[in-house]
């Protein structure tokens, strides 16, 4: 039995709609327009499908659960915010609707380091890159 191409197109449409709504919601969280994180059922309601159907469809279309994309994007946003030294880690946590200790647990679970360790290693890496660039500029060619 051949599965109609229309079925696969709809799967990808649902997945794309979810990712679009996810990005919009996370932008709203970061900007402060929204103060509570959505759950899968909230996204399902926005795109007019049942939560179980949304989860199954995204898993089938992408190989990953909706939570995978949510956590991946949340980690990207967290890392970006942590790269700004003027934002305290506790403020990053609260902006992303976490209390600081739960944010640390979340971040460490997905990155293998605490937010503080990530921030320190990020700036250490930047300093090393800057030093390498300076060293390259100072080297004089023997020819």
PLM feature segments, named:
Residues 57, 69, 81, 106, ...:
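Residues in the recognition helix of alpha-helical DNA-binding motifs
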Residues 32-33, 80-84:
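Short alpha-helical segment immediately N-terminal to, or the first helix within
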């Amino acid at each position: 039995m051949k599965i109609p191409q229309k079925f696969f197109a709809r799967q990808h449409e649902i997945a794309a709609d979810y990712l679009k709504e996810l990005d919009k919601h996370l932008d709203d969280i970061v900007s402060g327009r929204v103060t509570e994180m959505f759950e899968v059922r909230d996204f399902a309601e926005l795109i007019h499908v049942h939560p179980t159907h949304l989860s199954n469809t995204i898993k089938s279309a992408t190989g990953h659960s909706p939570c995978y994309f949510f956590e991946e994007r949340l980690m990207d946003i967290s890392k970006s915010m942590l790269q700004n030294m003027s934002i305290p880690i506790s403020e990053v946590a609260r902006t992303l609707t976490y209390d600081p200790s739960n944010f640390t647990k979340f971040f460490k679970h997905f990155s293998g380091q605490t937010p503080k360790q990530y921030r320190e290693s990020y700036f250490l890496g930047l300093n090393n890159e800057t030093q390498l660039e300076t060293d390259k500029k100072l080297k004089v060619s023997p020819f």
